[in-house]
Amino acid sequence: MKNTLSSMILDDSTIVAIATPIGVGAISIVRLSGEKAYHIALALTHKESLKPRYAHLCHIYDAQQMPIDEALVLYFPKPYSYTTQDVCEVQCHGGIVSARAIVQLCLKLGARMAQAGEFAKRAFLGGRLDLAQVQAVAGLIQSQSLEANKILMRQLKGDLGTFVNRTRENLLEILAFSEVHIDYSEEVEESYIRDIQQKLAYVENELSHIYHISLTRQSIIEGYTLSIIGKPNVGKSSLLNALLRYERAIVSEIEGTTRDTIEEMLTIKGSLLRIVDTAGIRESDDKIEQIGILKTKEALMRSNIIVAIFDGSRPFDAEDKAIMEILKTQCQNKYILVIINKSDLPLQCEEELLHNLLRLHNKALLCMPLHLSTKYEGVQKVLECLEEVVSTHNGDESMILTSSYQLDCIKKALECIVKAHNVLDIGQLELFSYQIQDCIESICKITHPYENAELLDRLFATFCLGK
């Protein structure tokens, strides 16, 4: 039997879970939701009542009526709670002993263990959150940058839901026109057709804008990836260490010291930057080094930013020119920063070759002479360039789709609009109506996936137990 969304009924059984990470800390939170949540909280605290939305300082008692902890207990009555059910939270002392003991007491008093994401699932089924807001919650839990949080908070506040509803209303207006005139399509005046085409073009432009701007700004959500490339011993690991301000990679005069990619995280202007120090690119018979070079090329493919380092104290050789060819042919849609290292020594390389290369590149940043020392000197210019890249995307008030599911829904809606234009041009109003209906369905799936619940099950399974 197909698992449809209509078959998913809001379950009022009482669930319990620890909502905070397990381990040593100031507090742990045990969360309850369901019909017995309030009565279980009263049994735990020996209170006759709990005032809604107030923090009550209480002792927590075990089955032998002995106090096992002191905690703050909060009660949120339905429907004005996260799950739209009665919800109680017990904020006990941190660590694992108290929280686990309280969970066991709740189980004995009639609760069951919550499944992963079950609290958020109940919030969705109860109408507290739409699917876009649920995905925003999941994104906030996994977020690794402040800029991503800002985007996800817009989605959590309901901005995407508002956009979906507005688009749906515009499409319904277009659909109503076509439905009325289906039986008299030969008699429809051209002015009405032009009016519908204009309204549909407006919807198409809005959807196309949000789709393409979301594609170009996924790095804000997922983080930027920067790969440092160059032949062996040109200063790649020195740059990584300088950016991180500590000795992460071994720096040696021996060529080929870095044989594998090294990845580290850095936050710039509120955005996450994954820095990949790659193995030097050169011809090699060493099998291990060959694997490292292959990983370097794979890192290039998934990077947004490439920092290419060349040794300015030596003339360019075949390996340098091979790297230039990679920049020219494989990195056209990536930001490129070129560093001519060892600028403290007399310049021997053909600097003009690099300038000519960057002039042909649509996302070239800068070609700079630099002296990368073990004292982390000279890195400020590099940081300024990286801040410039991040700043071009951050701070934009445009709404951004934050998941591949949302992007796919918009893409399918745009495909329906293209087909709708085509059949409208030849006067096929019935086929036009079908395409508009499909378009509405695709748009609405962003917030309310009516077809089946498997997507929801997969999504909620990615949540932690207490969310």
UniProtKB/Swiss-Prot annotation:
SUPFAM superfamilies: Folate-binding domain, P-loop containing nucleoside triphosphate hydrolases. GTP binds at residues 233-238, 252-258, 277-280. (6S)-5-formyl-5,6,7,8-tetrahydrofolate binds at residues 31, 89, 128, 467. It comes from the Bacteria. Pfam families: MMR_HSR1 (PF01926), MnmE_helical (PF12631), TrmE_N (PF10396). NCBIfam families: mnmE_trmE_thdF (TIGR00450), small_GTP (TIGR00231). Exhibits a very high intrinsic GTPase hydrolysis rate. Involved in the addition of a carboxymethylaminomethyl (cmnm) group at the wobble position (U34) of certain tRNAs, forming tRNA-cmnm(5)s(2)U34. This is tRNA modification GTPase MnmE. It comes from Helicobacter hepaticus (strain ATCC 51449 / 3B1).
